[in-house]
């Protein structure tokens, strides 16, 4: 099934290495070896072919796909736009194309001493930004007898492992302690950020999941990627909330960690309503708990009791934010410990056809309770629904007519989140209910 909707307009092989990245930053892993530059990968017999090779374990036109279709290739060029320059002026950081806070995510911002002769900053977010410095594996990684495991030992980043991939993607698509994307940046005009691992994995892919990929790297499961991504994103939020340096600015917590739409609403609006998952009254700034909320749905087919505990702990965290920093830290650490303990089980779980109905039912139940009161949660629901619908079709659970109907309902759901400024809770809930009714 083609992965559709708004965002197209815009597996676990070894738990050990992926989980270890929680302590050893993904950024450190990427920057631990010299970066030789995109040009070192673009030879026509390597990754620079104009067309995909038929009888190859990889497509070999990865460079061409990246250069022509992938926004990562134009990330550095974006810094020369009038909008980027305006943001930089407001922040007082000078030329955005030279400012570290911008280069961290709009380029491969490896230190000067770790750059090879063919490295160019203007290449944007290139191969080694995600696959890691290639100094120790470039020459050997395609040799006969060299395995993917060998490449990982030599410094290649394990992007095939969903936990590791999520930790890396989040460094720029949401921000982490070592690449903090702050509310000041947003206030200066930077677009709001959101992320969902499975959806973003399939935006302009330069790879395909086939027999060769599966043989080398293991079975792929999109719903599991979605599930893992929600857990890792939730962990990241809670780590930042309890980070005295990255998560706080003076007497204030870092506001980028909070729900944008809890404050950014029309002054004439009267849209507040209660949420069981927070227990907060009107006029209270709320943490952006969209990923935590989604992780409860992840658990629906895995451990319902754990999902219930997570609801209680999430509510306790929201309540703690109205009391003190100490209470907030304690509640956040407790919730983080729960998610951290559940993540390996989620990553190892086989999200087969029988689990999809449980996930959709859990999502729909929260809609009926009024949990999706703001755009951020609705956006995550739409991306979750896409992962589940794709899985329905890939698993052969629906026939062609049912697949067409589901795609139509999914497109209608995405249409309701196309514009966050005019988002309608009622239209969103109606579209979600229609999608749920059409599901097997």
Give names to the regions the model predicted.
Residues 1-4:
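Positively charged n-region of N-terminal signal peptides that target proteins for export
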Residues 8-18:
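Bacterial N-terminal signal peptides
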Residues 23-29, 50-89, 117-125, 133-375, ...:
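Primarily the internal scaffold of c-type cytochrome electron-transfer domains
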Residues 24-44, 48:
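Short N-terminal segments immediately surrounding and downstream of signal-peptide cleavage
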Residues 34-43, 95, 99, 124, ...:
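Residues immediately within or flanking Cys/His clusters that coordinate Zn2+
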Residues 39-47, 103, 128, 170, ...:
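Cys/His/Pro-rich metal-binding microdomains
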Residues 89-128:
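Post-signal peptide N-terminal segment of secreted/secretory-pathway proteins
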Residues 365-372, 376-440:
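A cross-kingdom marker for long, charged
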